[in-house]
């Protein structure tokens, strides 16, 4: 699905790195909580290892940039909590409506 304008694509490209950095900062804080929690060091290690393995698949961590996948990346970012509808204020109304509909917001 590629219904978005060239302007929306340029905005997306300009924002994705910042969104990913903010999302990874949030994840790092959650990892610190895991490591600081109660339990055996080995349990915390393996819990964290499993979590990182899952998290690194998120678009908020990494995604291969392509305009044809912009829709899917943005839906994933919304569903992961890497971005919120407020983060889309610079985008076209059409894009915001589509995101709101498909993200179930």
Label every PLM stretch briefly.
Residues 1-105:
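Acidic, Ser/Pro/Thr-rich low-complexity regulatory regions
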């Amino acid at each position: 699905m590629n219904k978005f304008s060239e302007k929306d694509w340029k905005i997306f490209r300009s924002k994705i790195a910042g969104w990913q950095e903010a999302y990874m900062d949030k994840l790092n804080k959650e990892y610190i909580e895991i490591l600081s929690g109660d339990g055996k060091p080995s349990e915390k290690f393996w819990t964290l290892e499993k979590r990182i393995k899952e998290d690194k698949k998120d678009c908020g961590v990494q995604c291969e940039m392509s305009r044809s996948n912009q829709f899917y990346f943005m839906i994933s970012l919304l569903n992961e909590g890497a971005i919120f509808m407020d983060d889309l204020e610079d985008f076209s109304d059409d894009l915001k409506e589509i995101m709101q509909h498909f993200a179930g917001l």
